[in-house]
Amino acid sequence: MEFQISRTRRPYEFNMWKSHWHPYYELFYLVSGHCKIFINHSLYYLEPGDMVFIIPGEIHRTTYYSSPVNERITLSFDKEYLNDMTQSCGSHLTDSLFQSSKVSIPAGSRSYAEELIQKMVYEGAGQDGYSPMMMRNYLYELLIFLSRCQEARSDAGKMEIGEKAIEEAAEYIYHNYGAPLTLNEVAEMIHMSPAYFSRKFKSVTGFGFKEYLTNIRIREAAQLLINTGKSVTDIALECGFGDGNYFGDAFKKIKGVSPRDFRKMQGIR
């Protein structure tokens, strides 16, 4: 992948059937409708004109609500696609953008952003040999424009007390995935009954408790398989899987291959 752009309309009833993460950058722009997106351990409410930045490896799930039809535009690209911009402007601009996770474009400026995106869609159809250069330049222009719109704007005011507590629980899981965590333990930590916590966690994040915990553990295990020479058994234990067979089954369910085969696919023996 170098660069991809897609425009999608989703009905209110649509929800991502599973969480996912990927090895490339993603810009998610909401054209119409309303949705919330849970990224790693943080919840964001999106309205038309909001742009979300997702960096490689971030676990996320989108849930739509209130509007019968929701329209979004997604731009995906790998790190190398930004090389020319980084060399010209330095990495500060892109680093600060992707650390912010969300930018709200003022209503009076949305047409500018959407025109740039539409130009990328046009060039993406492959007009001629200049199209790849034009798409790259339009993306760079969009990123500079977004950096000018950037504000430290929090969604905390939109969240209920219960939602804030769920964010706190998710952050705890995110940083303590290697421990033998249980639903009861985390529910007690934020002073909720296990049954209520289970329902609330699902409604806020889009994930079931076990699903979220397993996805975090598998993501970290995949990185250890690629970047270390540790044995599969040691990685399973380090990532909170007390049973090697369960680790293998969970890994294959999410990644489609066994841990050993995944490592071989990366060219690692």
Where are these regions (language model features)?
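Generic protein-terminus/edge-of-domain signal
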Residues: 1-51, 58, 65-66, 87-94, ...
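Non-catalytic, well-ordered alpha-helical scaffold segments
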Residues: 114, 133-140
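Terminal helix-turn-helix DNA-binding modules in bacterial transcription factors
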Residues: 171, 175, 180, 184-185, ...
